[in-house]
């Protein structure tokens, strides 16, 4: 059983859930995931590990509640328990000191991008993060990404936050400018 320490709604149908999972927190690397089951007999769901605190023994998951199984997971309130959390699983993202990098994500993809961007910054890279969404309520983790990104650029399809349009326009401008051109681009 894994205790839910917090469960916060970030955007429509998107939750940030922090769990007590010391073994997973100590072993996880960026790009890995866990398999979560809310209760006995429920479906097993793969979820990206958004963040981990090895000292505190916690992992953070970002969960888009779009089906019955993910809805049952996010219905577990703070203080409640998830039946199973298996992991970390999967091949971690290889992190190198590239220099200047661009990290790009949209909507719930921003949550998947978060651990990769953080690890790239921790490795000494100058990270420009470009995030997008349909509208302002779908822009997530901008402040958190700003804590370690050199720059955070935001786009929304309707122009309600940041630049109107798509993340690709921001990337095209960055690539066209020799002074801002990234050595590597990571997109989810």
Model-derived features: where do they sit?
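Ferredoxin-reductase
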Residues: 1-78
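FNR/FR-type flavoprotein reductase catalytic core
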Residues: 68-188
């Amino acid at each position: 059983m894994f205790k839910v320490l917090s469960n916060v709604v970030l955007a429509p149908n998107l939750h940030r859930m922090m769990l007590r999972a010391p073994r997973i927190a100590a072993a996880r690397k960026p790009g890995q995931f866990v398999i979560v089951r809310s209760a006995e007999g429920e479906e097993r769901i793969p979820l990206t590990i958004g963040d981990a605190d090895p000292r505190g023994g916690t992992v953070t998951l970002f969960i888009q509640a779009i089906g019955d199984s993910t809805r049952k997971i996010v219905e577990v309130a703070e203080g409640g328990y998830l039946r199973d959390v298996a992991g970390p699983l999967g091949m971690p993202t290889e992190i190198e000191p590239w220099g200047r990098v661009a990290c790009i994500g949209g909507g719930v993809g921003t949550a998947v991008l978060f651990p990769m961007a953080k690890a790239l910054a921790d490795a000494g890279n100058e990270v420009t993060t470009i995030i997008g969404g349909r509208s302002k309520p779908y822009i997530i983790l901008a402040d958190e990404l700003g804590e370690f990104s050199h720059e955070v650029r935001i786009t929304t399809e309707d122009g309600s936050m940041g630049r109107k349009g798509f993340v690709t326009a921001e990337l095209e401008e960055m690539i066209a400018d020799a002074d801002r051109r990234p050595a590597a681009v990571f997109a989810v």
